[in-house]
Design a protein with these regions (language model features):
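Ser/Thr/Gly/Pro-rich, low-complexity flexible regions
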Residues: 134-271
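A short, solvent-exposed beta-strand micro-motif common in secreted/extracellular proteins
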Residues: 73, 80-100
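Short, ordered, surface-exposed loop/turn motifs in non-cytosolic proteins
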Residues: 37-60, 157-162
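Short, acidic Ser/Thr/Gly-rich low-complexity loop/linker segments typical of extracellular
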Residues: 57-74
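Bacterial Sec-dependent N-terminal signal peptides
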Residues: 1-6, 11-39
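Extracellular beta-sheet/turn segments enriched in Thr/Pro/Gly and aliphatic residues
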Residues: 105-135, 266-269
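Structured interaction patches on ligand/partner-binding surfaces of diverse proteins
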Residues: 91-121, 233-244
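Short strand-edge motifs at loop-to-beta-strand transitions and within beta-strands
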Residues: 73-77, 108, 118-120, 192-200
Length: 271
């Protein structure tokens, strides 16, 4: 009896191994998002990917394979060889990808029969350009200023800009996942061409990362467009230096109704 049980278990184990031993993915799909033949800068947050591979056919239940897009607009995905369709996540974006025109529902898809590595670039037209980004320390605030230009040539009118954001990080990897962020409403009368300003309390940078004694920070700004809450237009990543290790002033972290300028002496006179 024991021999029969052992033989039965061995047969089950062998069968399970036979089914589990699939070939590893061996085909690489890669490329670059381009705007005016230059790399298009993206969010870079892996929770906000753009592309989705899926397969169709009898017996296939495929929820899709997301392809991560880095902040520099490059992407690379390892796949099994086979037939795929590539499309975009079914959300609105602050740009148009020429190869994926938007329909009434969702986006078009592109068919690929992947038998070997494929390099495919895609061309983007954003609704707005961000340029001339610069940030300075003003009191306890990091103040970023940048220019915005509405882009012509899109198939749909550009939605208006509703919010500007600034993200701070301790390295070059700054995106919408970065924990230190501030946002500012954009005037509804803003035409889409001009300068915008967004600021953040520097103490949020100090307290937002553990044991953060750095005198520098990396930052990016982003634009949120009307009715497009899931993806933003991002700037390049830049660095600001000269951030004090300690702040002598009292800030809104401790005083609810704090507004600059604040005179410490007037509230705490000498005894």
């Amino acid at each position: 009896m024991k021999k029969i049980i052992i033989l039965l278990l061995a047969t089950i184990l062998f069968t399970a191994c036979e089914y589990d031993n699939y070939d590893a993915p061996s085909v690489t799909f890669s490329g670059q998002l381009l705007y005016n033949d230059k790399p298009f800068l993206c969010d870079g947050n892996d929770a906000r990917d753009i592309f989705l591979f899926f397969q169709e056919g009898f017996g296939k239940v495929d929820w899709g394979t997301k392809m991560h897009t880095l902040a520099d607009g490059s992407y690379q995905q390892l796949l099994h060889s086979g037939e795929y369709k590539l499309t975009l996540g079914n959300v609105k974006y602050p740009f148009e990808i020429n190869e994926f025109p938007a329909g009434t529902v969702g986006y078009d898809s592109i068919y690929y029969d992947l038998k070997k590595d494929v390099r495919q670039d895609f061309h983007i037209t954003p609704y707005y350009e961000i340029s001339d980004l610069d940030a300075k320390l003003e009191g306890i605030n990091i103040v970023a200023k940048f220019k915005v230009k509405k882009v012509s040539g899109t198939s749909k009118p550009a939605p208006r800009i509703v919010k500007a954001r600034i993200y701070l990080g301790i390295n070059h990897f700054v995106n919408s996942k970065s924990p230190v962020v501030a946002e500012q409403e954009v005037d509804a009368n803003f035409s889409g061409d001009g300068e915008l300003t967004v600021s953040i309390d520097a103490i949020k940078y100090r307290t937002g990362y553990k044991e953060n004694y750095r005198d520098n920070a990396f930052y990016r700004v982003a634009l949120e467009l009307e009715n497009i809450p899931d993806y933003y237009l991002f700037s390049e990543t830049k660095e600001i230096t000269g951030i004090p290790e300690e702040f002598d002033d009292i800030t809104n972290q401790y005083l609810k109704n704090y507004k600059q300028p604040f005179n410490v002496v007037s509230y705490f006179p000498d005894s």
